[in-house]
């Protein structure tokens, strides 16, 4: 058990949104729960009762009422709220308990001055852009694609598109042409909205050539709308219109197309590290219910909050963030390089304090980021709680990778002792976290607090049995409304079934190793398909990184295990990226081995340690352990990884060269 770092206040039930929900359950459903575990058990055993309570508690507006809550619980293909019609955008724009003049979007950027939208201004912009899309012929089922960053216009476009019953999809503008076309050629968008470029730190990035290449590769695009972001005075290329024209004056009312509960809302994509990215279709109703539940009951967000999560439009956390107004929360957007201080007219300087200053300047109450960012701040010995005013901050979220115990202790030592740290894990596949935090439970170092309401998460042994207190495969044994409607262009559902249900029929296999404790806390130790198996003992990759990357000399690392075809122990290989100017020598190798042996076990000591310039990562910063392993076992680079999905595809060359040298081929 990790160190106890935070305990809920004694009046948590009186002051939290989940406390209010519990009182509502008592009054409206005659249900009384002594603690979170009882509530969770009910939420995953009476699925229809729980999800109908979410619908009713949050007063979901339906044009046609559902004939049932869950008419078919079979996975895949569970049928939620049949007969219901509603619209996601309408619920986001309800912005409960917010006045017209209240700020609802606060956006900071390294490309332009800050922008704030009030609730009235947001509705007005959505009204105009909705009318503009209709003028372009966009209607129900059409796809609208955004090659745009985390700025208010992208959020407005999402709401305008989905208000029409059209389907939204975004790629961040740092995505290269191949990465974008691999995604959008699958869904064939009718309209493309694209920025001319952006600024990353003090570096201008012109994307006009990429936009031309993307348009050329997408014959389905009938209209291209240019958003002059890098250069506000830039003339639009021939054959395109402008954002100002799209958002022009109109008498058209702001209306919302009623669509079925499972009508496609947006298409997100798997990382696409091997083959084409999987186009994951999410539905209006499932995303709405899941985000209402998570944002209000787990993150405790409401009209008094300012909610920030560092994300680009190419990561599902952006979609999660921008649902914030549905629970009344103001959202804080940031576009730029989080690791530099960039001021107009001055060269950018390395500085991990930028996001903390943003939180202070905007009065952020809930700060979301990634585990690698928190660990980088710890390594740089930042103490943001002492250097900027974070007095408004009461919640901090971490995701993207497991957060080790030392990351937890750094937050409580250097950021604030009174905030609740919520480490959460989920995926693009469900556009949420299915394990995370909740105001009712304490925080222990290195441990995800609980399984989320409505998420029947289990750890399964190699024999397929549910286990407690030991490592197992993370599975979900009951449907969730935000599971995908399906994959795009997968009419028989084969690709969808193969992705999640091929190992355990009728049970969602997520691909992570998880340990669930007796009290319900969770520890995720890495991807199950990247497992290290030493003498029959499974080792998670995350624990390696938590030790190796705390060393001052090590900037990044990746570990893989190469099995012995004849049944031997195989080889455990560790690759490290060192700080500038350092070379790996036997002294540092010995120190790394010693740290792993002492902190973990002798089994964790690599057979070989090698230096590389960079660890391959996806565009959402995830390490590519499986493709590295494939390359090291002889798979050609082009077959092992879709290079368009990588932030640094050139990093694969070193592993290919290493494989040749190692095998002599």
Task: Identify the function of each model-found stretch.
Residues 288-306, 314-365, 380-382:
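Conserved AMP-binding/adenylation subdomain of ANL enzymes
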Residues 223, 558-564, 573-574, 593-665:
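Conserved C-terminal "lid"/linker of ANL adenylate-forming enzymes
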Residues 146, 171-197, 211, 360, ...:
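AMP-binding/adenylate-forming catalytic core of the ANL superfamily
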Residues 297, 394-521, 527-531, 544:
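Conserved AMP-binding/adenylate-forming
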Residues 149, 191-210, 231, 335-338, ...:
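Adenylate-forming
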Residues 38-42, 89, 105-158, 176-181, ...:
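Conserved AMP-binding/adenylate-forming core of the ANL superfamily
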Residues 159, 163-245, 370-371:
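Structural core segment of the AMP-binding/adenylate-forming
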Residues 101-103, 224-226, 237-269, 276, ...:
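Conserved pre-ATP/AMP-binding loop-to-beta segment of ANL
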């Amino acid at each position: 058990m990790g160190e106890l770092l935070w305990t809920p206040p004694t009046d948590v039930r009186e002051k939290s949104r989940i406390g209010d929900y519990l009182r509502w359950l008592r009054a409206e459903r005659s249900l009384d729960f002594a603690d979170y575990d009882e509530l969770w058990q009910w939420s995953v055993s009476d699925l229809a009762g729980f999800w109908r309570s979410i619908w009713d508690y949050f007063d979901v507006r339906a044009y046609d009422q559902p004939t049932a809550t869950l008419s078919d619980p079979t996975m895949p293909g569970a049928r939620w709220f049949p007969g219901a019609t509603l619209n996601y955008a309408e619920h986001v724009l309800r912005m409960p308990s917010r006045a017209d003049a209240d700020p609802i979007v606060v956006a900071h950027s390294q490309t332009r001055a800050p922008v704030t939208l009030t609730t009235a201004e947001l509705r007005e912009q959505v009204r105009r852009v909705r009318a503009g899309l209709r003028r372009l012929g966009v209607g129900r089922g059409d796809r609208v694609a955004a090659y745009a960053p985390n700025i208010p216009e992208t959020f407005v476009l999402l709401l305008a598109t989905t208000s029409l019953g059209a389907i939204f999809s975004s790629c961040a503008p740092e995505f290269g042409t191949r990465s974008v076309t691999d995604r959008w050629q699958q869904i064939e968008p009718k309209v493309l909205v694209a920025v001319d470029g952006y600024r990353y730190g003090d570096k201008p990035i012109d994307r006009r050539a990429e936009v031309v290449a993307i348009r050329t590769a997408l014959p389905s695009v009938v209209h291209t709308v240019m958003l002059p972001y890098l250069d506000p005075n830039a003339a639009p290329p021939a054959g395109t219109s402008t954002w100002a024209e799209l958002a022009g004056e109109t008498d058209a009312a702001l209306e919302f197309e009623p669509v079925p509960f499972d009508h496609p809302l947006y298409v997100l994509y798997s990382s696409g590290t091997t083959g084409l990215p999987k186009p994951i279709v999410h539905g209006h109703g499932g995303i709405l219910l899941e985000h209402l539940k998570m944002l209000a009951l787990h993150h405790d967000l409401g009209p008094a909050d300012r909610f920030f999560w560092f994300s680009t439009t190419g990561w599902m956390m952006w979609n999660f963030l921008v649902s914030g107004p549905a629970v009344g929360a103001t959202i804080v957007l940031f576009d730029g390089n989080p690791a530099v201080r960039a001021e107009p007219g001055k060269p950018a300087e390395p500085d991990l304090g930028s996001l903390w200053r943003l939180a202070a300047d905007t009065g952020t109450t809930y700060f979301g980021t990634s585990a690698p960012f928190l660990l980088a701040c710890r390594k740089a010995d930042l103490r943001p709680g002492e250097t900027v005013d974070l007095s408004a901050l009461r919640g901090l979220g971490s995701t993207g990778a497991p957060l080790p115990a030392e990351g937890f202790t750094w937050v409580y030592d250097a950021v604030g002792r009174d905030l609740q740290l919520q480490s959460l894990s989920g995926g693009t596949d469900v556009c949420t976290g299915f394990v995370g935090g909740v105001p009712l439970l304490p925080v222990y170092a290195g441990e995800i607090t609980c399984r989320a309401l409505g998420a029947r998460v289990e750890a399964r042994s190699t024999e397929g049995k549910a286990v407690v207190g030991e490592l197992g495969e993370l599975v979900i044994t009951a449907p969730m409304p935000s599971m995908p409607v399906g994959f795009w262009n997968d009419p028989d559902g084969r690709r969808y079934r193969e992705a999640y249900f091929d190992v355990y029929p009728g049970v969602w296999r997520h691909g992570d190793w998880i340990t669930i404790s007796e009290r319900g806390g969770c520890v995720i130790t890495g991807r199950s398909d990247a497992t290290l198996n030493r003498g029959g003992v499974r080792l998670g990759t995350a624990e390696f990184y938590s030790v190796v990357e705390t060393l001052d000399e090590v900037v990044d690392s990746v570990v893989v295990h190469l099995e012995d075809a004849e049944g031997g122990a195989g080889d455990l290989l560790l690759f490290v990226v060192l700080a500038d100017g350092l070379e790996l020598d036997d002294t540092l190798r010995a120190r790394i081995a010693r740290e792993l042996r002492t902190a973990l076990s002798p089994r964790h000591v690599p057979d070989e340690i090698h230096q590389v310039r960079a660890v391959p990562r996806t565009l959402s910063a995830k390490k590519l352990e499986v493709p590295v392993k494939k390359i090291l076992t002889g798979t050609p680079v082009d077959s092992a990884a879709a290079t368009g999905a990588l932030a640094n595809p050139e990093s694969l060359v070193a592993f290919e060269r290493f494989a040749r040298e190692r095998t002599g081929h």
